[in-house]
């Protein structure tokens, strides 16, 4: 049976918050009977998380839109005592009546994407705009967040689990916290920009930026990546796990080697003068 999935490209998000505004416009002051009560002001069912990596001038800033993951093995469903359920199309919904007064539901979500509505006395979260998807007159056939995005961050699709598994493998898609085994239906492209780190530097030879220097990155004595410096004499090895690495540089016969440690932070070696 076909189910709904979402793919979010971290590399394309510019933190414009159009997705958040679309979500708020759809749900704040709007009650959708059978789906959800109105959203409380200030809640972020589509939350844009931010992370800056590295140091100026070779730093970067990345943004990760984070809705409900609509997990196949959803802890909120398993522990919700009927207040949270999963539809056949994969969408996970909180029953707006059965969830009243059950603030403990928030503790069942390992992703922290559930909110407590003080005004309605009920737990709430992203519904994937199920009320729109169920409406045949809704021509876009996608949630408001995806429809509002002008940067093509979101890909929304309805397909079989088998077809989605093939897409995940072919495109190298990832999920948040895979170790939990919740099997989210929200996947990410370029998630490394938010979860992993890089090592970078600039190479100067006789005071000038050196283009074309050979740079090798090793871990445990084995080469894991290689690159050449660009016009500005810079190189960058990204998507690195925590650990110790060796950077070896050959700039027209001039050599350099250094050991760097990635420990939840990107490393900029500055300008290396050869």
Curated annotation (Swiss-Prot):
The keyword Transmembrane helix does not apply. CDD domains: TH_beta_N. It comes from the Bacteria. The keyword DNA damage does not apply. It catalyses: 1,2,3,5-tetrahydroxybenzene + 1,2,3-trihydroxybenzene = 1,2,3,5-tetrahydroxybenzene + 1,3,5-trihydroxybenzene. [4Fe-4S] cluster 2 binds at residues 23, 126, 129, 145. [4Fe-4S] cluster 1 binds at residues 13, 16, 19, 149. [4Fe-4S] cluster 3 binds at residues 68, 71, 76, 109. Its EC number is 1.97.1.2. Binds 3 [4Fe-4S] clusters. Keywords: 4Fe-4S, Iron, Iron-sulfur, Metal-binding, Oxidoreductase. Pfam families: Fer4_11. InterPro entries: 4Fe4S_Fe-S-bd (IPR017896), ET_IronSulfur_Cluster-Binding (IPR050954), Ig-like_fold (IPR013783). Its cofactor is [4Fe-4S] cluster. One of its GO terms (molecular function) is metal ion binding. Heterodimer of a large and a small subunit. Isomerization of pyrogallol to phloroglucin. PANTHER family: PROTEIN NRFC, PROTEIN NRFC HOMOLOG. This is Pyrogallol hydroxytransferase small subunit. It comes from Pelobacter acidigallici.
């Amino acid at each position: 049976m076909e189910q709904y999935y979402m793919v979010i490209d971290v590399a394309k998000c510019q933190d414009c918050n159009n997705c958040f505004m679309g979500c708020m416009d759809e749900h704040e002051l709007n009650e959708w009977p059978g789906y959800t009560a109105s959203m409380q002001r200030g809640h972020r069912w589509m939350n844009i998380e931010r992370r800056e990596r590295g140091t100026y001038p070779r730093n970067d800033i990345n943004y990760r839109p984070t809705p409900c993951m609509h997990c196949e093995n959803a802890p909120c469903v398993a522990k919700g005592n009927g207040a949270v359920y999963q539809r056949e199309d994969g969408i996970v919904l909180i029953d707006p009546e059965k969830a009243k007064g059950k603030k403990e539901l928030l503790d069942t979500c390992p992703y922290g994407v559930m909110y407590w509505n003080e005004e309605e006395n009920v737990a709430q979260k992203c519904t994937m705009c199920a009320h729109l998807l169920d409406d045949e007159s809704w021509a876009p056939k996608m949630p408001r967040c995806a429809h509002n995005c002008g940067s093509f961050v979101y890909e929304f699709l309805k397909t079989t689990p088998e077809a989605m598994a093939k897409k995940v493998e072919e495109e190298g898609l990832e999920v948040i916290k895979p170790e939990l085994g919740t099997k989210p239906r929200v996947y990410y492209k370029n998630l490394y920009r938010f979860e992993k780190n890089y090592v970078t530097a600039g190479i100067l030879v006789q005071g000038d930026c050196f283009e074309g220097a050979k740079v090798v990155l090793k871990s445990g004595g084995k080469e894991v990546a290689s690159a050449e410096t660009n016009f500005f004499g810079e190189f960058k090895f990204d998507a690195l796990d925590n650990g110790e690495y060796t950077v070896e540089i050959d700039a027209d016969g001039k050599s350099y080697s250094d050991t760097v440690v990635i420990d939840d932070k990107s490393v900029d070696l500055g300008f290396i003068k050869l």
